[in-house]
From Swiss-Prot:
GO terms of molecular function: DNA-binding transcription factor activity; sequence-specific DNA binding
Annotated protein name in UniProt: HTH-type transcriptional regulator RipA
Gene source species: Corynebacterium diphtheriae (strain ATCC 700971 / NCTC 13129 / Biotype gravis)
InterPro entries: Homeodomain-like_sf (IPR009057), HTH_AraC (IPR018060), HTH_AraC-typ_CS (IPR018062)
Keyword Ribosomal protein: no
Amino acid sequence: MSLPSIKTTNSYCVVLWCDQGSATINAPDRVVQVMAGDVVLAPHGAFVTGHGVVLPMAFPDFDGGEHTRRLHMGTAWSKRMIFEFSRSLLGETRPSECIAALFDDRARPPRVPEPQAARKVAQKLIAYPADQTPLLEFAQLHNISSRTLQRQFVASTGFTFSEWRAALRVSVAADLLAHDFRIGQVSQMVGFSATSSLTRAFKRHTGDTPSSFTSPRMHAVCEQQPPMIPATTTFARASDDIALWIYSGTATVTTPGYCRFMGAGETVTIPSGTSTRLDVSAGSVALPVPLAAAHDDLTLSDVLAASVNPLAAVELQRLSAQERADVEQVLVPSV
């Protein structure tokens, strides 16, 4: 299945879920290959190429940091992540707690230093974590003293150059271990001279060994069932005429003087500027689609193609607390 390249147009990080096939995430700091069941948190500027179905989710109030991170969650999470995609299209500003928690780990990459020379060194190491270039040589490349470069790292990140590099390697190693690479392989891939060196660095930066750090995390994410999809109620207004498609389950759409109960596969038109109440049942997913893109045989790929097209993308704005209070007595489901 061929889809257009996805470019993140927001100024904040984006969550990317590979639902089908495989693709490439081209992030500012690294290039990541993904397959079905992978979720990636990428900074502003990331774009997707390839033939997989990758759902981009933008959450303005979610600070995911400056580094790209990937987890393999398994395809059992598909419906739960499509629900998360729906939340982003319906105006939510933060991911669900269970999704945000996936990236709240002790192997988070270290902060990128701000001074120009140190930042360029950091960017080189982010692109090539196994690079063995010593501090002195990096300093000479940037025409500064090694002391100055060291001070830049410490002042901006709290780490010496060597510890910053170790912290970065630990973060990359955690990602590789999550994808079933052996510890010995990972040690070499990220630039440690021996498995024992990786283990010591892991203990310093996470408090655990690679095996004890990875196993509980991946058991929790990959082996357990994803959380149930909760029932949701959304009060919103569209900037343009849109169609609301029930991807799965059931939902009730209420506008002034109108109420409709809907099942999977059905669509309803919501005119521009109309205050709308959307009640989605537990276990169900509803997706807004530009009216021009709606048809009788919609697929997830159709919604994706429309959502990443800046000329057709749906803009659905949540009602403010005051606006919701004003319409709540009017928008009462009657079915």
